[in-house]
Amino acid sequence: MNIQKITFGNGCFWCTEAIFQTLRGVQSVTSGYMGGRTANPTYMEVCNGDTGHAEVIHLEYDADELSFDELLLVFFKTHNPTTLNRQGNDIGTQYRSAIFYYTEEQKQKAEAMIKRLTDEKVFDSPIVTEVTPASEFYKAEDYHQNYYNDNPDKSYCAFVIQPKLNKFAKEFTDKIRPELLR
């Protein structure tokens, strides 16, 4: 195994966590906060915009099974990287599109992917995703972890997360953990 880590901010971490948990090669997904100016932020502080943190997921993945470029494609295709501080009805700097990298190679690959997607005109508007060095990661409160799987009957899961998972599954069937395919 070749375990690597990356932290993504691409909207509400409940949605993002649910998507990345289904990927083959992903060893762990932890919801949390990064990119702010205060230590140990709470969900309410982040939501109020008091800390400058983004809602993020911290991933550990086996790079022998899932490449960083594949992760980047999933990242860009499962949220709107062209809206500043917004994903759908979720508005605020905590929902910004961000890649928090740990190595210079990750930075270069992220910047190259943005250039490629821009050159290919994949999106109608410019990509506004931040590519920034990882800072301190703060794990979110326990009730945010594994949210979709623990709360499938909640309306947010049914009306927001499930449609995103369905769209993801259609485009990335070959990347889904085999045991999750029905």
Question: Where do the model's predicted regions map?
Answer:
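Flexible coil/turn and secondary-structure edge motifs
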Residues: 1-182
